[in-house]
Amino acid sequence: HNPEDWQTIARINKLTAPYIIYADGEIEVPLSLLKMEELSLEVVTVSGKAVLQRENGKGAALTQGMRIAPGETVMTGEESFVQLLFPNGVYTRIDPESALTLSYLLSLADGKIKAEGLLSKGKLTNTLKKQLRFNDSMRTRTPVVITGIRGTEYRLKADGERSATVETLEGVVSVQSGSKTVRLRADQGLKAQEG
């Protein structure tokens, strides 16, 4: 876009002269600086009662085939679940009495997909049938942790505002809480608490 964008990226990532970024390193780039196309999720399965809370505050009964846009929230009732499909092949099952907001879902100019959801309460399972493409990202937040798919399947439970539980079923999942990041392999889990 413009030459000052680099200064913004350097400031956000706390880079100092000579501004070296190493191979396999990660940097944060504000979405406002990226060329992108906004995408939506597909509702694959609805069992029981589920509601789609739109960004304008209006709610609607969730049905199979509906599309979910960034800013919208899926809420499941008692004994209900919803299964969603992301464009990159990730399936998300939202368990009973849960709420997941799609923070963003976009395709960059190079076709890479970036997605993030916020699980404010309840439990979900993310399942990936095949490895994500290089530089695709799929993150799910709770009030306490951020998880990123590095493998194939994991569960995430938001235990209120102060704790979260992550269980890796297959593959590897990256979990960040505060300034600490750990990688959980299959059959590993953790419970993170605020503070």
Tell what function each PLM region has.
Residues 3-38:
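Extracellular LysM carbohydrate-binding repeats and other cell-envelope/extracellular binding modules
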Residues 23-26, 32-195:
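Flexible, surface-exposed loop/linker segments and immediately adjacent secondary-structure boundaries
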